Amino acid sequence: MNRTASDPLHIIILGGGPAGSACGLALLKLAAEIKRAVKVTLLESKQFTGEQHYNQCVGVLSNPLPDLMERELLVPFPTDLTRALITGYTLHGDREELPLEGDAEPSIALRRVQYDGYMLESAIERGVQVLPARATNLEFHEDGVIVYTDSAPVEGDVLVGAFGMDEGSAAFFSRVTKYEPPQALSSVVTKYHPGTEAMEAFGKHIHAFLPKHPRIEFGGITPKGDYVTINIAGRNVDAPLMSDFLKQPAVRDALPNFEIARKNDADDLRYYKGRFPCSLARNYYGDRFVMIGDSAGLVRSFKGKGVTAAVQTGIRAAETILSVGFSRAAFHDHYRSANEDLIGDMSYGQTMRHVVIFMARSGMLDAVIRAAHKEPRLRHALFGAVSGHEPYRTIWGDSLAPASLTAILGAVLRRTH
């Protein structure tokens, strides 16, 4: 490799989403604080400016993300990108529904491609060098790492994987390391413009659906200013399944002015497909490499607060690299421990996910919703589950409280008589 001892520490980041941009910003901020020379190169082939590429995430952001950005990255939260404020949720079962309001600040709905572009531009302004190229292969050596691209190769000291669920990047990483990407759910996203009056009548709630359909784990309708975003997720959801979802009576009743979809905007009801992790990746760090965000599977069940987790893990990887090192032992001792808030809650979240799916498909969810109308603690648990504002450990505590269990049992018994 063509590197010398006098060269600054060179960190290469694969991926320019929030995780990669946050990691680059954190590296430069921390390096300035400890007066260490670093070079950060970020590889991203997508063009976020001009919205030439899209992110299939629904795009609802909430605390603690604004404070995290401003405190840890010195980057103001882009409130000017706000398309709508989300004040609560409406949970739909098969026949029942429940409005859920929390005490926290409203969440912010925005276009994810605009947020991603803002973060990447902020990183560039601070000194991150962005190479508009796609990584194609890599090599690890005792004295560094080489990333081959569809442009020129890049040599560095340590590699940060921030490529989300990109299967090509995961494949070449898996060939040269023991990395195994997280298991994934697929999603289909669409949108349409209902008109100003219909949007005002729709309100500021996200409508969350837990249908009986065996292939759909959850769906949602999210207001975004002058349009609504609709998404479904499951092991293998596809376009026909989205069309079926849109025909369900409970969904159709919630959709504002659906009959005018496509009449005012030719792009209405175009379907976009994506993937997101539903488990922790295996071997997501090693000598000279570490995964962050979706690439590591470091997210909550139901993908709540995915951007917050991406930014958090990007910052934590930067702290490990500059304060401890970039060996496998350094990442194991520091980076993994720093993410214990996410890792430790995963088993609770996975169990909650399976229980919710069982209740929805067995018809029990309606009884739980009826019980929550009367029991505040159960209602608080449901809000925490759909909003992502509470750890799943806390949600289980509220769900299994005697008052919650009594209310659920009473609702089930009334259903059977």
Please report, for each region that a protein language model flagged, where it lies by residue.
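FAD/FMN-dependent oxidoreductases across multiple families
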Residues: T82, N137, D238-I321, F326
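Glycine-rich FAD pyrophosphate-binding loop
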Residues: L14, L28-Y54
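Beta1/beta-strand and adjacent pyrophosphate-binding region of the FAD-binding site
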Residues: N2-A19, T41
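N-terminal FAD cofactor-binding segment of flavoenzymes
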Residues: S45-T90
